[in-house]
């Protein structure tokens, strides 16, 4: 059986970034359930907006986005809607509108050939034995068994690695539901929607390449019903839908306490959403995926004696930032406080009317 220095499970932004950064420095194997190219396979429900912090990560790495990853149009404000209060405000934001699936495949394409990458595979089992991590996965129609000194869980909200390391760990989860429609709005826009009767998280919309995408994060039990109810409510705010072209669904984490951030143990590490590194106030996770990958790269290459403790300490600033997002989320989802902020007009940019 083949042995590696590092086995990475999952090649979203976090896993792809780490694999790229370790290439040529350590012997790495990376496993991913997405296809290598094309439009088939798993596509994560995501508004597809690249936040300024994520943009800074690309500046740091000297990377530029290819044109086929960038979506049209580029929107410079977010229309914030409080459904219960019937309030709408416009706030300036500096996001880059991207095609999320194309972005994920592009990130994978940057991984050098020295990394052994398996696409469209199923990781079936992991365990630790004789100071090694064992991984069994199915690829190309047959099962393979490898070992690694270090195991990295970059496998998102339903992380197999996190469940193995922390079987009793509980974190709030929501179902993210998103539908695509033919664009009917005369002026494209991006929106953030709050309705506490529907969800204590939030919903969103984005215009992208001739489509209007509407989605949100809802309680697991009756998420589809709540999503449908909110769609009906949004007609009062001039949202236009029609027949859905495509529907997407996945689990999303919603950290609500300091203990929700878990970094790993026993030479296993968690990065990105698998570690709980996702903003509770916006559900933005790409920037934290890239940052945690960079932090772990540095730790792995330095090889400190207590390597898991070193990673835990190195992510302290990141975790504090994310804890601040939890506090911000509680403010944004508190109806009275949100209503007061929006009515105050702070940072609101009124749109001129003809």
From Swiss-Prot:
MF annotations from Gene Ontology: FAD binding
Pfam families: FAD_binding_3
Coiled-coil stretches noted in the UniProt entry, renumbered to this chain: none
Domain of life: Bacteria
Protein family membership: Belongs to the CbrA family.
Name by which UniProt lists this protein: Protein CbrA
Taxonomic source organism: Shigella dysenteriae serotype 1 (strain Sd197)
Gene (UniProt): cbrA
């Amino acid at each position: 059986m083949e042995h590696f220095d590092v086995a990475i499970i999952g090649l979203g932004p976090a896993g792809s970034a780490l694999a790229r950064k370790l290439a040529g420095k350590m012997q790495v194997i990376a496993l991913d359930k997405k296809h290598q190219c094309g439009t088939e396979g798993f596509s994560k429900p995501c508004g597809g907006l690249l936040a300024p912090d994520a943009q800074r990560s690309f500046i740091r790495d000297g990377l530029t986005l290819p044109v086929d990853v960038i979506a049209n149009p580029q929107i410079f404000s977010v229309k914030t809607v409080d459904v219960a209060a019937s309030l709408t405000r416009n706030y300036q934001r500096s996001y880059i509108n991207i095609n999320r699936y194309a972005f994920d495949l592009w990130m994978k394409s940057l991984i050098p050939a020295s990394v052994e990458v398996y696409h469209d595979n199923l990781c079936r089992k992991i365990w630790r034995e004789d100071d090694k991590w064992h991984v069994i996965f199915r690829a190309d129609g047959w099962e393979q068994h490898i070992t690694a000194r270090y195991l990295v869980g970059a496998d998102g909200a339903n992380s197999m690695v996190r469940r193995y390391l922390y079987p009793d760990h509980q974190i709030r989860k929501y179902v993210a539901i998103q539908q695509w429609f033919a664009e009917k709005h005369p002026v494209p826009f991006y929106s953030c929607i709050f309705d506490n009767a529907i969800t204590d998280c939030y919903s969103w919309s984005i215009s992208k390449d001739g489509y209007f995408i509407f989605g949100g994060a809802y309680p697991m039990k009756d998420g589809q019903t709540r999503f449908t109810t909110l769609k009906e409510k949004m007609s009062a705010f001039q949202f236009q839908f029609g027949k859905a072209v495509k529907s997407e669904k996945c689990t999303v984490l919603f950290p609500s306490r300091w203990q929700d951030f878990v970094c790993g143990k026993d030479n296993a590490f968690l990065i990105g959403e698998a570690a709980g590194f996702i903003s509770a106030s916006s559900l933005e996770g790409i920037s934290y995926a890239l940052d945690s990958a960079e932090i772990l790269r540095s730790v792995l290459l330095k090889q400190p004696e207590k390597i898991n403790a070193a990673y835990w300490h190195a992510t302290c600033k990141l975790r504090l930032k994310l804890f601040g997002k939890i506090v911000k989320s509680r403010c944004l989802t508190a109806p009275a406080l949100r209503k007061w902020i929006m009515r105050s007009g702070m940072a609101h940019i009124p749109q001129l009317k003809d």
